[in-house]
Design a protein with these regions (language model features):
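Glycine-rich FAD pyrophosphate-binding loop
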Residues: 10-30
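C-terminal lid/capping helical subdomain adjacent to the catalytic/cofactor pocket in oxidative enzymes
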Residues: 12, 103, 308-357
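Helix-loop-beta segment of a Rossmann-like dinucleotide-binding subdomain
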Residues: 67-78, 90, 101-106, 110-148, ...
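Helical element adjacent to the flavin cofactor pocket in flavoenzyme catalytic cores
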Residues: 124-180
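Central helical "cap/lid" subdomain
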Residues: 176-222, 345
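Active-site lid/adjacent beta-loop-alpha segment flanking the redox-cofactor pocket in flavoenzymes
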Residues: 215-312
């Protein structure tokens, strides 16, 4: 969120200093699956998701880099009647938010997506959704922001933040910086910054368990997921042939060192669910697993908008593992809000003041 916000602010003529505690893109983004989806999303996020989807196809031109955005569609398989009911209710509700899902019967799945979900009783398909490369997007935004005049400091650990007569002062291991405005895009650590200004946000830190196979013949075009009340599996095949997968098991806990670690004992259970989506993966070799820290706000909605206590402070954090698709829209919306004082995309559901009521 930080690099996208920095980029869109520079496009509006704002001088930006971006302070990164680690390396660009090494936080929740790099742990992301890379899913560009609106299907199954919390409905209050849909206007923001629609805004973001309209930007993804323009990023290669704007950022000067192919971030591997591909609108391959998002297929969500259904294996039981609970999943079918979930899909039907969401499909009905989502119509008012600008999303229309195709409903597929088993014969449609076999014809359009052979080899996927042979035991599925139905599926939904969102043709405009897809995926992008989470390892490329943050560096691409950061590079474009720098070319637009932004100053970027990596491995800059913040020790103090204070409100001054003219704005804010931030003391870091890379020096002390002053600015008129402060944007808190600190991800899972966003509540720590908000707390400095008297704003509490209930959040839990956890990490997804992700994995990737060896390169395989390219057979899986859409992103594939499941409609389920449980932690359903999901996967996609990248252009190099590797299949990236996740879900189906509980998120890993974050240790005292601030890192999320995978639990290798969960891999067997995870793969059992993955092969339900694509049985041909039963013989695939897993070459790597990973995780990363994500912040899950108590009500599973992000914090986004102006501070409720401090003039000139803005927040954009806590996207609960659903933020990758939203990133460009968040950056664009925050830049609009900061430079004009309002936003054409509704942000009220994400107001930090909801926790002080």
């Amino acid at each position: 969120m930080g690099t996208a916000t920095a980029y869109f602010l520079t496009q509006r003529g704002v001088r930006v200093t971006l302070i990164e505690r680690g390396h660009i893109g090494a936080g929740a983004t790099v742990a992301s699956f890379g899913n560009i989806r609106r299907s199954g999303r919390y409905l209050p996020q849909m206007p923001l998701a629609n805004r973001s989807l309209g930007l993804w196809s323009k990023l290669e031109t704007w950022l000067g880099m192919d971030v591997e955005f591909r609108a391959t569609g998002h297929l969500r398989l259904i294996f039981d009647h609970d999943g079918l009911a979930l899909m039907q209710q969401f499909r009905k509700d989502a119509l008012d938010w600008g999303l229309e899902l195709e409903v597929l019967e088993p014969k449609d799945i076999r014809k359009r997506f052979p080899g996927l979900g042979p035991d599925a009783i139905a599926a939904s398909f969102s043709p405009d959704d897809g995926s992008a490369n989470p390892r490329l997007i943050s560096p691409a935004f950061a590079g474009a922001a720098a070319r637009g005049g932004a100053t970027i400091h990596e491995q800059a650990h913040v020790s103090e933040i204070s409100k001054t007569a003219s704005g804010f002062e931030v003391v870091t291991s890379a020096g002390t910086f002053s600015a008129d405005l402060l944007v808190n895009c600190a991800g899972a650590w966003g509540p720590d910054i908000a707390r400095r200004f008297g704003e509490e946000v209930p959040i839990t830190l956890a990490g997804p368990q992700m994995g990737v196979t060896e390169p395989l013949p390219h057979r899986i075009l859409p992103v594939v997921g499941v409609w389920s009340k449980q932690h359903g599996a999901y996967l996609r095949q990248v252009e190099r042939g590797n299949v990236v997968f996740g879900g189906a098991v509980a998120r890993t806990q974050v240790g005292a060192d601030g890192f999320a670690k995978i639990d290798p004992h969960n891999l067997s259970k995870q793969l059992q669910e993955v092969v339900k989506l694509v049985p041909a993966l039963r013989q695939a070799t897993i070459i790597r697993q990973w995780s990363g820290v994500e912040g899950y706000v108590e009500d599973m909605l992000p914090v986004m908008g102006p501070s409720g206590t401090t003039q000139g402070l803005f927040h954009a954090f806590g996207f609960c593992g659903h933020g990758f698709q939203l990133g460009p829209g968040v950056g664009d919306a925050m830049a609009e809000l900061i430079t004009t004082g309002s936003c054409t995309t509704p942000l009220a559901p994400f107001d930090i003041a909801r926790f002080s009521a």
